[in-house]
Amino acid sequence: MDPKDRKKIQFSVPAPPSQLDPRQVEMIRRRRPTPAMLFRVSEHSSPEEEASPHQRTSGEGHHPKSKRPNPCAYTPPSLKAVQHLQTISNLSENQASEEEDELGELRELGYPQEDDEEDEDEEEDEEEDSQAEVLKGSRGTVGQKPTCGRGLEGPWERPPPLDEPQRDGNSEDQVEGRATLSEPGEEPQHPSPP
């Protein structure tokens, strides 16, 4: 038998009845990426990222997914930004060295060192100490009654509820309510109820 004489075997399989609507089949075909689309998508993405059909949603049709930059990802500064930072740092170094030169010249002429720098350091130390005291005061110590806050004059207590009548030290209700001593050594006398 010659190879030319061989017949091709063809299987005739009846096509299964399509359960999908022809419009749905067309939409699926449109969503399926073509090799050209895959090439276009991979051309724009970084080499590590592969374009996969899982990244697409059904509503996008045949357009490639628009990628948003990840806000958490590190993006290196541009060349212009680096050059700008270098010029700023060079300017600040030049200004600092000029100020040091001026101070050196003044000291050579006999001017004393400025006290402003020392005063600023002392003020910063005082601020840190006062902040530490405030923190210690807010924590309180064990067994101490907690206060609600610190006023300008010192700690203040929570005001009484509004439903109770306010009492100051001179009111008659408060004086009657307290036991009074008639003479030292005697027992307190309670006022008789009216």
Curated annotation (Swiss-Prot):
Biased composition (Polar residues): 84-95
Modified residues (Phosphoserine): S45, S46, S97, S130, S192
PTM characteristics: Dopamine- and cyclic AMP-regulated neuronal phosphoprotein. Phosphorylation of Thr-34 is required for activity.
Name used for this protein in its record: Protein phosphatase 1 regulatory subunit 1B
Domain of life: Eukaryota
Keywords of this entry: Acetylation, Cytoplasm, Phosphoprotein, Protein phosphatase inhibitor
Record gene name: Ppp1r1b
Biological process according to GO: behavioral response to cocaine; cellular response to cocaine; DNA-templated transcription; locomotory behavior; negative regulation of female receptivity; response to amphetamine; response to morphine; signal transduction
Residue list for modification Phosphothreonine: T34, T75
GO MF assignments: protein phosphatase inhibitor activity; protein serine/threonine phosphatase inhibitor activity
Origin species: Mus musculus
Chief location bin: cytoplasm
GO CC entries: cytoplasm; cytosol; neuronal cell body; nucleus
Family recorded in the similarity comment: Belongs to the protein phosphatase inhibitor 1 family.
Function, in words: Inhibitor of protein-phosphatase 1.
Places the protein is found: Cytoplasm
Compositional bias of kind Basic and acidic residues: 41-63, 160-170
Residues the record lists as N-acetylmethionine modifications: M1
Region annotated Disordered, chain positions: 1-194
Compositional bias per record (Acidic residues), positions renumbered to this chain: 113-131
Any Pfam family hit: DARPP-32
